[in-house]
Curated annotation (Swiss-Prot):
Binding residues annotated for substrate, in chain numbering: D296, N500, Y660
Site positions for Important for catalytic activity: E119, E139
Protein name, per record: Fatty acid oxidation complex subunit alpha
Reactions it catalyzes: a (3S)-3-hydroxyacyl-CoA + NAD(+) = a 3-oxoacyl-CoA + NADH + H(+); a (3S)-3-hydroxyacyl-CoA = a (2E)-enoyl-CoA + H2O; a 4-saturated-(3S)-3-hydroxyacyl-CoA = a (3E)-enoyl-CoA + H2O; (3S)-3-hydroxybutanoyl-CoA = (3R)-3-hydroxybutanoyl-CoA
Region Disordered, residue ranges: 708-729
Cellular component terms (Gene Ontology): fatty acid beta-oxidation multienzyme complex
Alphabetical UniProt keywords: Fatty acid metabolism, Isomerase, Lipid degradation, Lipid metabolism, Lyase, Multifunctional enzyme, NAD, Oxidoreductase
GO molecular function: 3-hydroxybutyryl-CoA epimerase activity; delta(3)-delta(2)-enoyl-CoA isomerase activity; enoyl-CoA hydratase activity; long-chain-3-hydroxyacyl-CoA dehydrogenase activity; NAD+ binding
Species name: Shigella boydii serotype 18 (strain CDC 3083-94 / BS512)
InterPro entries (alphabetical): 3-OHacyl-CoA_DH_CS, 3-OHacyl-CoA_DH_NAD-bd, 3HC_DH_C, 6-PGluconate_DH-like_C_sf, ClpP/crotonase-like_dom_sf, Enoyl-CoA_hyd/isom_CS, Enoyl-CoA_hydra/iso, FA_oxidation_alpha_subunit
Gene name of the encoded protein: fadB
Entry-linked CDD domains: crotonase-like
């Protein structure tokens, strides 16, 4: 054994060839600060070996290196800029020394090589991979950019266009694509990986492969003519500006850095990468996006822990076909759980099957599946007008009309047709689960399972625990949601549960602004362009359906009369009374016509102004700051109330439900991350300016206490140790 650290070791493999093996405790390898330091020590040992002829890097895990240890990021991001820059220089000196070894090097890459893992293998001369490879640089999705030389080496290896596509989008690619673009040199079966890598090394050692020529382009300026460079970087900057926008500085910074570094050799180019990385790491956007990643891990880990003692349902059923039922049936079948889809008429069943078939055909068109796979999946969806097969199902989700009487009747009837241990769930979006449970003989086997539309795209499923829902019931439904590829978050029961309960105060803020003379177009523009929502409130109401919102608004007002009962007729009432239900009937805040692709396209409609004039004061202008404050304060206050009342368990789960269920702008990180970034005292000052608008603007006492003591909702993070300590971590 030449060297042994906590996460890697170095040993002779055969005559003159050494192997450096990543083998961290636990299930995966991460390139954390300690591993970088250990790698530097191992390379120091190699530099002393006079009889070294070649080096092979590999992993003892199912994945090579899954990336940096993101749990370290928030503390690293608090390190002063100069210290963070010093540590990056140290880390890059390690990879430079790996790259500069006077012998050929190869990485035998299996599974994931992401982020720092990818940057590590870019420093070797050759890369051999297994078919399950996923390799790439996802850093821009975390609000930063590659910091271990990825933005320098990848463009020089692949060419600017291919590298920009991966780096700016935070992409990873599979084995075939990696081979095609030159990111790896070969793909072999897993059992032949090490032997194959040794064979390549022997060829390089014997002079059959020119490893020095392979290495040289990574040390030099990027080989691009002035015209090629102008075209590549101009196109890349335009595309990034269009897709990422101003709220995500990392992608455009990465492109500009690669452009600036193109004319320099390795050392100067790495200095430019360092100078770009450090300021990005100190942005609120990076903290928010890293926070989302960590919250996502926490939420998924919680679901895994919850379901460890239950069996995932093997057969499911959906009550009520149509778009929603068909979407749920498709998602279940697509992920391997056969499903019975029941409705009371053929027309709805046809609609549900058509929806499932349409989604599968899209997968076929994209080349994700072949005709055989399509036929196999669709054959596991069984449409029926009766309860045939219900005696075999493990879980049933009801997705009928949003009417408590209808839902109770359907659920009570279904309960008589299934096994005593079958779990029933309702896809209701607003009706309290405990109320629906009153119709059942076995309420302990019942809970809520709120999907979001469109089901195949929206990651969140709210799992609602009723007063009598058993732990096993919740666990089974969480297991099914996880199997469907969704992110389940368990909430306690109340009208609207969590997501809709906090959404409707936001709509109330919108209605009050319209009442006071604001223009709905400006509100939408501000909330989309300035705050960052994917849709403004008017457009969102048109998409959700104004009839749906009108009904849900009444349910929420009955559930929370003190805050959500309004004493005036609002824009939603006016449009509903005029039979303007949004995209579903082509008339809402806008008029809708289908474009060439069959998608609804909004157009101005003068009739809306007349309708809104009946429920609004004369038009007047509002500042962007006031629009954002009046829209967001009611929502954030309600989010805080949900935490204080135990409707949602943690700030992390609340923020993920908002991001995954409503599209809360990820660069803000969710309501609690936004609050912590803004500061609770500053938020309180802002909210107090609007207290006169009513109870929705009254800040909950718990938040007032946070403001008084300057306490955040997320646990405070300590800065990482000084850079000298990090080197020897």
């Amino acid at each position: 054994m030449l060297y042994k650290g906590d996460t890697l070791y170095l040993d002779w493999l055969e005559d003159g060839i050494a192997e450096l093996v990543f083998d961290a405790p636990g299930s995966v390898n991460k390139l954390d600060t300690a591993t970088v330091a250990s790698l530097g020590e191992a390379i120091g040992v190699l530099e002393q070996q006079s009889d070294l002829k070649g080096l092979l890097l590999r992993s003892n895990k199912a994945a090579f290196i899954v990336g940096a240890d993101i749990t370290e990021f928030l503390s690293l991001f608090l390190v002063p800029e100069e210290q963070l820059s010093q540590w990056l220089h140290f880390a890059n000196s390690v990879f430079n020394r790996l790259e500069d070894l006077p012998v050929p090097t190869i990485a035998a890459v299996n599974g994931y090589a992401l982020g720092g893992g990818c940057e590590c293998v870019l420093a070797t001369d050759y890369r051999l991979a297994t078919p399950d490879l996923r390799i790439g640089l996802p850093e821009t999705k975390l609000g930063i950019m590659p910091g271990f030389g990825g933005s320098v080496r990848m463009p020089r290896m692949l060419g600017a266009d291919s590298a920009l596509e991966i780096i700016a989008a935070g992409k990873d690619v599979g084995a075939d694509q990696a081979l095609k673009i030159g990111l790896v040199d070969g793909v072999v079966k897993a059992e032949k990986l090490v032997e194959g890598a040794k064979a390549v090394l022997r060829q390089a050692i014997n002079g059959d492969l020119d490893w020095k020529a392979k290495r040289q382009p990574k040390l030099e300026p990027l080989k691009l003519s002035k015209i090629e460079a102008t075209m590549s970087f101009t196109i890349a900057k335009g595309m990034v500006a269009q897709t990422a926008g101003k709220h995500y500085p990392a992608p455009i910074t990465a492109v500009k850095t690669i452009e600036a570094a193109a004319r320099f050799g390795r050392e100067e180019a790495l200095n430019l990468e360092n100078k770009s990385f450090v300021p990005l790491a100190h942005t609120n956007e990076a903290r928010a996006l890293v926070g989302i990643f960590l919250n996502d891990q926490y939420v998924k880990g919680k679901a895994k822990k919850l379901t460890k003692d239950v069996e995932t349902p093997k057969q499911a059923a959906v009550l009520g076909a149509g778009i929603m039922g068909g979407g749920i049936a498709y998602q279940s079948a697509w992920k391997g759980v056969p499903v019975v889809m029941k409705d009371i008429n053929d027309k709805s069943l046809t609609l549900g099957m058509t929806e499932a078939a349409k989604l599968l055909n899209k997968q076929l068109e994209r080349g994700k599946i072949d005709g055989l796979k399509l036929a196999g999946v669709i054959s596991t969806i069984h449409p029926t007008l009766d309860y045939a097969g219900f005696d075999r199902v493990d879980v049933v989700v009801e997705a009928v009309v949003e009417n408590p009487k209808v839902k109770k009747a359907v659920l009570a009837e279904t309960e008589q047709k299934v096994r005593p241990d079958t779990v029933l769930a309702s896809n209701t979006s607003t009706i309290p689960i405990s109320e629906l449970a009153n119709a059942l003989e076995r309420p302990e086997n019942f809970c809520g399972m709120h999907f979001f539309n469109p089901v195949h795209r929206m990651p969140l499923v709210e799992i609602i625990r009723g007063e009598k829902s058993s732990d096993e019931t919740i666990a089974k439904v969480v297991a099914w949601a996880s199997k469907m590829g969704k992110t389940p978050i368990v909430v306690n029961d109340c009208p609207g549960f969590f997501v809709n309960r906090v959404l409707f105060p936001y709509f109330a803020g919108f209605s009050q602004l319209l009442r006071d003379g604001a223009d709905f177009r400006k509100i939408d523009k501000v909330m989309e362009k300035q705050f960052g929502w994917p849709m403004g409130p008017a457009y969102l109401l048109d998409v959700v359906g104004i009839d749906t919102a009108h009904h849900a608004q009444a349910v929420m007002a009955a559930g929370f009369p003190q805050r959500m009962q309004k004493d005036y007729r609002d824009a939603i009432d006016a449009l509903f009374d005029a039979n303007r239900f949004g995209q579903k009937n082509g008339l809402g805040f806008w008029r809708y016509k289908e474009d060439s692709k069959g998608k609804p396209k909004k157009e101005e409609d003068a009739a809306v102004e007349d309708l809104l004039a009946e429920v609004s004061q004369p038009k007047r202008d509002f500042s962007e700051e006031e629009i954002i404050a009046r829209m967001m304060i009611p929502m954030v206050n309600e989010v805080v109330r949900c935490l204080e009342e135990g409707i949602i368990a943690t700030p992390a789960e609340a923020d993920m439900a908002l991001v995954y269920g409503l599209g809360f702008p990820p660069f803000h990180g969710g309501a609690f991350r936004w609050l912590d970034t803004l500061g609770s005292a500053k938020y309180l000052d802002m909210a107090q300016q609007y207290q006169h608008l009513g109870p929705l603007y009254e800040v909950p006492e718990g938040l007032r206490n946070k403001a008084r003591h300057n306490e955040p909702y997320y646990p405070p993070v300590e800065p990482a140790r000084p850079v000298g300590d990090l080197k020897t971590a």
